[in-house]
Amino acid sequence: MTFPRIAFWTILAFLVSIGSTVHADSRLVDGLGRHIDVPEENEHVICSGSGCLRLLTYLQAQDMVVGVDDMETRRTRFDARPYAIAHPEYRKLPIFGEFRGHDNPELILTLNPQPHVIFKTYASSMGYNPGELQAKTGIPVVALNYGDLGQLRSELYRSLRLMGRITGKQDRAEKVIAFFEETITELRRRTKDIPEADRPTVFLGGVAFKGPHGFHSTEPTYPPFQFVNAHNLAHDPD
């Protein structure tokens, strides 16, 4: 790395950190238990890591996004991500790194406008460390646990509420959570009295895990099948 490039990166990080420090007046605890100072009001954000942009889209905060990872700009014959289909404008945004959380601090610092906060779903074995990313960019990095609608539902809800608080979408976060809970309850109510012998046998293919996979990618404990009391072939092939 040449000296001018190092100087450019250092100066940008310093200037961004000054702006973040001046306006950071709200301290939050993120998904990794880190205490993070974030601006009280945020207009621009980016989402890093698997599923992160999906959660932000649930909150209808898509207009705040100023950059995406390279996954969002890829064109395929079939896109299995409903949020991306609903918002094709993501494809036109600047790229700040590679998918699965492999961010590029230099590209982040060239985004215009600059993000006030970086949301990041994080796994220790994959992607840029949130603390290191924050140190190199001077931008608050809020780590999130993606969770699911099964045993990790509380983590999903906590992440939605945290994102909602930072983006000013608290009411929307609660509406999304209420929708999930009401729908799950209704599905269970409708199917709980179906005799065991009459319950359908089903299989789910093409499950995405930290990115898209083929048809044979499945989930033995797929929560929606559990909600309707269906027999999941991947869980009980007999």
PLM region spans:
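A short, structured surface patch at a secondary-structure boundary
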Residues: 49, 53-112, 116-123, 230-233
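Structural recognition of the beta-strand scaffold that forms the well-ordered cores
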Residues: 46-48, 66-69, 116-121, 141-145, ...
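Sec/Tat signal peptide C-region and signal peptidase I cleavage site
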Residues: 20-24
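Extracytoplasmic substrate-binding proteins
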Residues: 28, 35, 134-211, 231-235
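Solvent-exposed loop/turn segments at secondary-structure junctions
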Residues: 51-54, 71-74, 123-126, 147-152, ...
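Bacterial N-terminal signal peptides
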Residues: 7-18
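Conserved H-X4-D acyltransferase segment
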Residues: 32-60, 208
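Alpha-helical, coiled-coil/dimerization segments enriched in small aliphatic residues
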Residues: 213-238
